[in-house]
Regions:
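C-terminal output helix
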Residues: 98-107
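Acidic, metal-coordinating helix/loop segments flanking the phosphotransfer/catalytic sites
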Residues: 28-45, 53
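Structural motif
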Residues: 6-11, 31, 47-52, 73-76, ...
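CheY-like receiver
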Residues: 115-130
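Short amphipathic alpha-helix used as the core "switch/output" element in two-component signaling
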Residues: 54-67
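Short, hydrophobic alpha-helical segments
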Residues: 107-115
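Two-component/phosphorelay signaling modules centered on CheY-like receiver
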Residues: 10-31
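Alpha4 helix (beta4-alpha4-beta5 surface) of REC/receiver domains from two-component response regulators
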Residues: 76-93
Length: 130
């Protein structure tokens, strides 16, 4: 994985899972993530909970959208996220609950590896559209 990766999810189990599968990632508590983004610190990739992202102040949320890779792990339906957010080529969605295949595809996408998305995985993992 190229560059700095941050993982911040409201669920400790999700943070722990990503910490184990992406050992080079830095795991942040939600409050710490907000503070760092407010200070203008930006990683190359961010894994964040969908509700957590929507609760960020607008200015901070806009900074997150400028990242090269933004993986949103969410239990919200895609309709619960702004269409402009979901359409961004630098944004991918990992729907909770997720299976191992979806998680592996999301991690490969984070790493910048082209991911072949199977038709049944298209809804849970939405990556760059070409």
């Amino acid at each position: 994985m190229a560059g700095l990766v941050w993982v911040s999810d409201r669920e400790p189990g999700i943070r722990q899972l990503f910490a184990e599968l992406v050992p080079e990632a830095e795991v942040l508590e939600p409050g710490e993530l907000t503070s760092r983004l407010r200070l203008g610190q930006l990683p190359d990739a961010l894994v964040i909970d969908g509700t957590q992202l929507m609760e960020l102040p607008q200015r901070v949320q806009r900074r997150a959208l400028l990242l090269p890779r933004l993986l949103i792990c969410t239990g919200l339906s895609l309709g619960g996220l702004p269409p402009s957010l979901v359409a961004e080529p630098s944004v991918a969605i990992l729907a909770k609950p997720f299976c191992v295949d979806d998680l592996e595809a999301a991690i490969e996408w984070l790493r910048g590896t082209p991911v072949k998305v199977e038709p049944d995985l298209l809804a849970p993992v939405v990556g760059p559209r070409h």
